[in-house]
Structures are given as C-alpha cells and as structure tokens.
C-alpha cells in the first residue's frame, strides 16, 4: 500500500477492487484519475493531481491507465481522458471530465466537507 498523500497507480483489476473495498471500509473519499500515456491534457494535470494528494492525505487518490485496465474503464463508462471520478462507499458521487484544475479542486473540497469523520 502506498503512503497517505501519494497518488496510487492501479495496474490490475484485483488491485482496483482492493482499493475500492478499502475506501468503502474506511469511508474515505476516493478520487480516480482515468488517464492515458498518449493524452496531453492528462500529462498537464498529473503534477497538480499529485500536489492535491499531498495536501489532502484524508482522500485516496488513484490513477488508472485506460489502456492498461480497459475493463475497468469500460465498467465505469469512461469516454474521455482525463476523467476524474469521485467515489464514496463504492458509488460515483461526482465526475469531472477534462484537465480542469479549479473544478477538480472545488469538487474534492465539496466532498471532503460532506464526509463525516469517524
């Protein structure tokens, strides 16, 4: 497992399921960056996404390469990159499509404030 404050690269379906289950068990907000190695905007926002992970250690930040995990991208209906999915207790609570720094940060903040701490 990665340390808090890091973006966790998910490379297998088993790892994906494990992280989802951990998020459900811990009642943590999970933000998933669906990305691709050939996607320019994905590269543009990657360092910003990593900065957010450092600033918000209570949130789990995952990164999924859609070419590496096609089945996961298909299951979650990802049609454009980057797509950021916000999950709580295994359900999608929000989504940001595109390299939109402000919208990404605001959406995370909105869902952190609505998460009750145990």
Swiss-Prot record:
Disulfide bonds: 39-42
Chief place where the protein resides: cytoplasm
Keywords recorded for this protein, A-Z: Cytoplasm, Disulfide bond, Electron transport, Redox-active center, Transport
Domain named Thioredoxin: residues: 2-113
Annotated positions for site Deprotonates C-terminal active site Cys: 33
Subcellular compartments: Cytoplasm
Pfam families, alphabetized: Thioredoxin
Site keyed Contributes to redox potential value: positions: 40-41
Keyword Transport: yes
UniProt KW Cytoplasm keyword: yes
Active-site residues (renumbered): 39 (nucleophile), 42 (nucleophile)
A single GO cellular-component term on record: cytoplasm
Function of the molecule: Participates in various redox reactions through the reversible oxidation of the active center dithiol to a disulfide. The H form is known to activate a number of cytosolic enzymes.
Family membership: Belongs to the thioredoxin family. Plant H-type subfamily.
Protein name stated in the entry: Thioredoxin H-type 2
Organism the protein comes from: Nicotiana tabacum (Common tobacco)
